Amino acid sequence: MTIYALSSGSGISGIAVIRVSGPETREIITKMTSGSFPKAKQATLKKITKIDTKEVIDQGIVIWFPGPQSYTGEDMAEFHVHGSRAAVSYTHLTLPTILLV
């Protein structure tokens, strides 16, 4: 099972961090970003998009932590998006659509 959560705390902030962990993490990164897949443990600036329309949600940092060398032991990612309610909400709304497909 792949899980995701806001890890930086709720409320408006400069940056919000959403963590994803589980076997579908690689697929989530591929579907929500464009261009090349990020290198392991390297912060990469990416456009983060809705999967159905490819509308840009935000431009932020994506960090890929392949398992078992991640701190969860599974494939894991962090999406660092702007901390507005809109960016966080749209990212949270997009993640389950990937997991249900």
Regions found by a protein language model. Name each.
Residues 97-101:
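N-terminal low-complexity segments that are often proline-rich with Ser/Thr-Pro
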Residues 1-95:
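A glycine-rich (often HGG/GG-containing) alpha/beta subdomain
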